[in-house]
């Protein structure tokens, strides 16, 4: 054994070829944490000291290659400021450079995922061979940063500026065919041929059949474009990238382009310094903190879901009650992920609607070449429409998705319970009605759980799994595991009106109503909140949700939280409802909707909307300060999020933030309501609440936040 470290071993194979093997002990994956980087340095020294080694094959002892840097170490490194980040990176560059500069050929045998720092490791090798099962890429932009271990410098020299920008800015892992086509890897082979293929390349390089020194030299020099070609390449790249990523919201792509441009005319070592300086600028942004936090929060949510796996019972057959758009969407989602599902309704027209919805969604998959026609047929065969309960004795879980009316739901749930086995779980897809309340209609409330899908089901990743007062842990566990099997991200919450997401969303709509009442133009509110980062403003959002749905939901919320969700005035949303303006459902709401050239509903300004709300505006019509609009909208939403934590509706800030991002489109680069409070500063946030407390209870800082401010605490760190 030439080197035996905690993360890397080096041992001789044959013919002067050694295996440089990454296998981080005590971990399921390889990653570049501090320990691995130190061991990397030691392993390089061991190779340098051994005169028998003529070439290296770089391998992994895990099912993945190297998944990247250790993101949990970023917070500590990034908190030190730009200079300290550069001072941290440059010694890492020296280690990677010393490996690249070894006077012998090196081939990476990429057996699985090689992302971020993992692929940057591959780039310091002279050749790269990829298994058919592997994926490679530099997705750091998703974290609000960009490649920091030399990836931007080496990839741009290897595959050209245009391709490199696309790889890094789009942040999409590349499959073997795409990586080979772009020239990022040199060969793709079957998994069982990987080591042989990599070893053969090393042999060819040692024998002189491959000019590995010339291939390496390309990465050590400036980009092979003259100044005019460089300017054209970067102008094209900037146009494409900045059209998709607003630098005010996502600064990393622009910083990446600036760094690439600064380093394009420089040799490797100077270009790496430019990369490090740009990386440091990105790393200290609040967006990087939020997006890295989001990645870590996603791991927290996945870990919480995994803990339910042991307590779940298998779901071999599911059923959905109600064959509307929602029921059809649920049936499609279950069937497309392999779970057979019975779809029941009270009439053939309703069943036809549900099957049409599933059929339309599957047809789109086929048209986009994401599914073969035969697979579509197999998926449709997993959905069995029925008018009776005859087959319900074989069902493991029933998802009720009938109209959002407590009396209707109670009747349907009680009837269903009589037609299923004693251990069958019944889940309600209610969006606001208390699970504990609905459970009173049942004989076996322990088998009853909330399973709240968001609309449209096939697109929205979140499922709220709601624990009622008497819901068993088995019911929770089974529902969580089914949601995961359906390709969704489940978050378990405790019962209350609106659960988590809608409980937080309705004060946001309430803040909108109050702003309009006070004289704000709803279009200004929409524009301000869109620029803030929401996918759409609140007026447009309520039009999309359905104004009737919003009004009915608001009634449930007002009953549950009268102190802050029951206004003593009639708002603009209710005015629209009374005027039978329901939003996109009937093409008139706050906006008017007409089909565009693509057949999608496009919004236009409708003067009638202003006439409808005019009688309910009591304030002087004026242009509000943008920051006041942001503060009033965000305080109402963030306060209710904090109250949900205070009331133990949701277990952690991580889950609360993820739910808001996945459920209502909270701007990801702001990290969620809890991260937003942290970044505002908890004491400063509480002071803002005090400033607007005269507007009502929704604006009063929850005691939890006052305590945190007094003790200098944050949600994160």
Swiss-Prot record:
The keyword NAD applies. Residues 1-190 are annotated as: Enoyl-CoA hydratase/isomerase. Pathway: Lipid metabolism; fatty acid beta-oxidation. Pfam families: 3HCDH (PF00725), 3HCDH_N (PF02737), ECH_1 (PF00378). NAD(+) binds at residues 326, 345, 402-404, 409, 431, 455. CDD domains: crotonase-like. Its EC number is 4.2.1.17, 5.1.2.3, 5.3.3.8, 1.1.1.35. The active site is at residue 452. The record marks 120, 140 as: Important for catalytic activity. One of its GO terms (biological process) is fatty acid beta-oxidation. Keywords: Fatty acid metabolism, Isomerase, Lipid degradation, Lipid metabolism, Lyase, Multifunctional enzyme, NAD, Oxidoreductase. GO terms for cellular component: fatty acid beta-oxidation multienzyme complex. Disulfide bonds: none annotated. Involved in the aerobic and anaerobic degradation of long-chain fatty acids via beta-oxidation cycle. Catalyzes the formation of 3-oxoacyl-CoA from enoyl-CoA via L-3-hydroxyacyl-CoA. It can also use D-3-hydroxyacyl-CoA and cis-3-enoyl-CoA as substrate. Heterotetramer of two alpha chains (FadB) and two beta chains (FadA). NCBIfam families: FadB, PRK11730.1. This is Fatty acid oxidation complex subunit alpha. It comes from Acinetobacter baumannii (strain SDF).
